[in-house]
């Protein structure tokens, strides 16, 4: 993937850039793996906003991704196409298995049309192959990692992300997360070799607010410019600094997002660096 920069023909085009989509080999998805996707605008079943800054955006169809890959062990698959997915930053690869089934997976860096991938404990260590962590050598970069055996991939699924397998001890493997956190995971959990492709996604300059609206992202307004009825930081005569430590619109202190009493915290060897108090 490469980034194509626009010429400054309009204010919205000045500095803006876009992916060249050179790796895409097909523009229409596999019909049997597409499901309807209804936008909810960040509302719950009662119509109340539960996630702010969402709404609008282009209509999308959901591509069913195989995050498990645990029921095709020993069955080789050929990469038929590399496709665009509007629901994620990574590209997706359409696999044609030898038994005739078709499935999508997240496309790792270096995977191209015509390559052959496989899954299972005896698979080779090459990008796109899926194995249990106990069968992957230390130091290998992996993505699409499970947190629980058989639970499906949960970690390192976005464009350019990867996790390094540091080592294995007894029934746990130590992983260095993209955030720098070191975490232990059951060695029976599966992971896909390689890092996620489309790493240049992070370098795209969107150029104008309208492109964010096309993606379904609404404006994020600072609490300090609101009225007191709308936010704890609102109000005041003229410009003010808020007058208190940063809080959410509901008065909760900003930052501390992790549950200190979570049972899985004991599996975290070293926390990510946040600039805030750890363990909160």
UniProtKB/Swiss-Prot annotation:
The segments labelled Disordered in the record are 27-58, 226-280
Mention one GO biological process in which this protein takes part, according to its record: cytoplasmic translation
Domain of life per record:
Bacteria
Q: Where is the composition biased (Basic residues)?
A: 37-58, 268-280
Please give an example of a GO cellular component term from this record: large ribosomal subunit
Stored InterPro entries: NA-bd_OB-fold, Rib_uL2_dom2, Ribosomal_uL2, Ribosomal_uL2_bac/org-type, Ribosomal_uL2_C, Ribosomal_uL2_CS, Ribosomal_uL2_dom3, Ribosomal_uL2_RNA-bd_dom
Keyword presence, Ribonucleoprotein: yes
Which key words are in the record? Ribonucleoprotein, Ribosomal protein, RNA-binding, rRNA-binding
Q: Which GO terms describe its molecular function?
A: rRNA binding; structural constituent of ribosome; transferase activity
Q: Which SUPFAM superfamilies match?
A: Nucleic acid-binding proteins, Translation proteins SH3-like domain
- NCBIfam families found in the cross-reference section: rplB_bact
The protein's assembly and partners: Part of the 50S ribosomal subunit. Forms a bridge to the 30S subunit in the 70S ribosome.
Q: What does the function comment of this entry state? A: One of the primary rRNA binding proteins. Required for association of the 30S and 50S subunits to form the 70S ribosome, for tRNA binding and peptide bond formation. It has been suggested to have peptidyltransferase activity; this is somewhat controversial. Makes several contacts with the 16S rRNA in the 70S ribosome.
Which family does the record assign? Belongs to the universal ribosomal protein uL2 family.
Its protein name is Large ribosomal subunit protein uL2
Tell me which species this is from: Mycobacterium ulcerans (strain Agy99)
